[in-house]
Amino acid sequence: MTKPSQPIKIIFFDIDETLYVKSKTYIPDSITQQVIPQLKEKGIIPAIATGRNFGGFPQALKPLIGEHGFELFVTINGQYNFYKDKMISQYGLTIAQIERCIEKLNALGIAYAFVTPEEIAVSEENPIVRAATAPIKTDYVVDPKFYLKSTAVQMLAFYPESRDEEIRASGLLLDELKAVRWNQNAVDILRIENSKARGIEDVIRHFGLNIENAMAFGDGFNDLEMFDTVGFSVAMGNAEEELKQRADYVTKHIEEDGILYALKEFKIL
């Protein structure tokens, strides 16, 4: 069994289906009562690394935010990163990129959204938009010109996997942007060089650590670059198969206390 090569000093956790069971809207007790308190006691930094913006964090996570829990955040796929209330780094789309996306998506009849560090603004309301955003944010703004009022770090586009090839052929992405699927009817649209990995590298430098001191837990496609970057990666038992293949270790399912199991297995806790 592969083991971490260096002492683990910081651990990055994805939110959905890693820390948080989205379908049942809860965080396992093993995380709230054992994992986070014990990491803090040992001086290991627990950090969030998520595709969500801070304004879209689930309510169940809120009690774990603060000096006794999470104070370090890699959000919006590494594009807005902060410690306590201090920003470490921010990346985003240019106005030209946003307006090209709007033009292409309008021509394709696809609804879209703008994501800022705190808000999500959708171009229109429809059943697909409501279903996709329901687990992350219900109090979104409806405003197709929102990007002119507030800096949009990334966009969302609401279309099924069956349209993936059509989107690739449309010229929407070119060689500047990428689409990362997080829902059967929704993708993140971001600059091709941006990912959780970029945010993690910024955070590691900020704290004067080495990447070998970093561990990460995840389950989805937006965790692939993160797994390639950190010193040791752990895929949840419920993770996408491609991520499991990329991981250094595959632990148990989220509802089988997979995070606690792995940390005990490697004697980190």
Predicted regions and their residues:
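Mg2+-dependent phosphoryl-transfer enzymes with acidic/Ser/Thr/Gly-rich catalytic loops
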Residues: 2, 6-10, 188-269
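Asp-based phosphoryl-transfer active-site loop
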Residues: 7-25
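A short acidic, helix-capping loop that chelates divalent metal ions and anchors anionic groups
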Residues: 19-22, 81-85, 188
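Short, acidic loop-to-helix structural element flanking the phosphoryl-transfer center
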Residues: 25-44, 90-97, 194-205, 213, ...
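Active-site phosphate-binding/coordination module
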Residues: 30-128
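Short active-site oxyanion
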Residues: 43-47, 70, 153-155, 212-214, ...
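Short, structured coil segments at secondary-structure junctions
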Residues: 68-69, 172-175, 229-230, 245-247
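Conserved acidic, metal-coordinating active-site core of Asp-based
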Residues: 100, 104, 108-217, 221-226, ...
